[in-house]
């Protein structure tokens, strides 16, 4: 089996529009949670979210292409291009048909879906955009990454709710470890801070509904009351070790195992004894 390392990374997050600013914010303990600005929250039970602030795609996506992308896809294309730059692949010779792209998203283009359903309802089917479907389906995110960077290896999407991004990285890891590819771009993206998205999660009592941003995301506290909806994207460049060494790439880390499970307990709640999480960790350690 091949050894797999990380040679590039990119991020668009609620605490930074790029990798460096995100990393510095994390080190200094900055809080990305604040009041909703992406829509009028006056009818909402929930008022705190973690939005990507002052997002500017212009350095990575041309205006015409961006108009055909949902916000979640804009995030991942920017993050993927940051990862590409960080990896040094732009100055290396490599086979673009040997690059796999695998991106996870739990919901996909919810902003596009909401906008187009509103058009259908108010103005009729003739006003629905021809880009409605190709902008909203989850696999458009890896597709745009492949097209923007010219990668011709397998291009796949993972949809496993909150585990989508992690599963994408694990799937990419295994494809390199087992010798199918030398390079993979893997990660996740989400942009579900819309009125419909927040309403749906709030009505199933999944979201925190208080107004104290410093006590909103406290998953291990006895007073926890739900999660905070965020958005953004993170992409890693995974590479076979010898391939990375041959081009003198900077190596950030090595991935040595990955595990999955399903507790088969409930559609939203995890097993109270953590059986699924335990099994996944055990499988990762033994992988």
PLM features: what roles do these ranges have?
Residues 41-51, 108-112, 191-217, 259-279:
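Active-site-adjacent elements of ketosynthase-type condensing enzymes
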Residues 76-89, 141-142, 146-190, 228-249:
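Active-site-proximal alpha-helical scaffold in enzymes
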Residues 1, 86-104, 115-130, 147-155, ...:
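Structural signature of cysteine-dependent C-C bond-forming condensing enzymes
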Residues 6, 27-160, 189-198:
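Conserved beta-ketoacyl condensing-enzyme motif
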Residues 9-16:
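Short polar catalytic/cofactor-binding loops
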Residues 3-7, 30, 34, 212-287:
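Condensing-enzyme catalytic core mediating Claisen C-C bond formation in acyl metabolism
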Residues 18-29:
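Short Gly/aromatic-enriched secondary-structure transition segments
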């Amino acid at each position: 089996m091949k050894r797999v390392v990380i040679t590039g990374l990119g991020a668009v997050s609620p605490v930074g529009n790029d990798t460096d600013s995100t990393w510095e914010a994390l080190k200094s303990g900055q809080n990305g949670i604040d009041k909703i600005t992406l829509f009028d929250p006056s009818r909402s039970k929930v008022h705190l979210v973690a939005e990507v602030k002052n997002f500017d795609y212009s350095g990575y996506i041309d205006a015409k292409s961006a108009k055909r992308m949902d916000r979640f896809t804009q995030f991942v294309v920017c993050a993927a291009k940051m990862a590409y730059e960080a990896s040094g692949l732009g100055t290396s010779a490599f086979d673009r048909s040997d690059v796999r792209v695998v991106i996870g998203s739990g919901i996909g283009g919810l902003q596009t879906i909401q906008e187009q359903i509103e058009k259908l309802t108010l103005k009729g089917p003739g006003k629905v955009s021809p880009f409605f479907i190709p902008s909203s389906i989850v696999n458009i995110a890896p597709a745009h990454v492949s097209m923007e960077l010219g990668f011709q290896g397998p291009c796949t999407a993972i949809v496993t709710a909150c585990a989508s991004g992690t599963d994408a990285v694990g799937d990419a890891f295994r494809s390199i470890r087992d010798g199918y590819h030398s390079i993979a771009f893997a990660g996740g993206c989400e942009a579900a801070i819309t009125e419909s998205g927040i309403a749906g999660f709030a009505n199933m009592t999944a979201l925190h509904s208080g107004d104290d941003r410093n006590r909103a995301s406290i998953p291990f506290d006895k007073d926890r009351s739900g999660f905070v909806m965020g958005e953004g994207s993170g992409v890693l460049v995974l590479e076979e070790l010898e391939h990375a060494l041959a081009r003198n790439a900077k190596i950030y880390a090595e991935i040595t195992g990955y595990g999955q499970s399903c507790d088969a307990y409930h559609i939203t709640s995890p097993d109270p004894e953590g059986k699924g999480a335990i099994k996944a960790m055990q499988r990762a350690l033994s992988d």
